[in-house]
Amino acid sequence: MQNEAGEYVDLYIPRKCSTSNRIIHAKDHASIQINLAIVDEQSGRATGETKPYAICGAIRRMGESDDCITRLAKDDGYIPKDF
């Protein structure tokens, strides 16, 4: 990407935590991104599409990442509501 002066610069797009909507900064080495594969209900095979979930290090430090992933997957309809 080029700026107005014609110099090549890198484009940094920060990620946001899927649970807390905090910006995950570049030095947050405890943050993770999990891609859940979307599965066809008829054949039971992965379609090649994924749904990414990003969890920041603060949520992981509290030990809440597994509950957050489960809640997000329920909200998106990947896990039944009565799970």
Swiss-Prot record:
Transmembrane segments: none annotated. GO terms for biological process: endonucleolytic cleavage in ITS1 to separate SSU-rRNA from 5.8S rRNA and LSU-rRNA from tricistronic rRNA transcript (SSU-rRNA, 5.8S rRNA, LSU-rRNA); endonucleolytic cleavage to generate mature 3'-end of SSU-rRNA from (SSU-rRNA, 5.8S rRNA, LSU-rRNA); translation. InterPro entries: Ribosomal_eS21, Ribosomal_eS21_CS, Ribosomal_eS21_sf. Disulfide bonds: none annotated. One of its GO terms (molecular function) is structural constituent of ribosome. It is found in: Cytoplasm, Cytosol; Cytoplasm; Rough endoplasmic reticulum. GO terms for cellular component: cytosolic small ribosomal subunit; rough endoplasmic reticulum. Component of the 40S small ribosomal subunit. This is Small ribosomal subunit protein eS21.
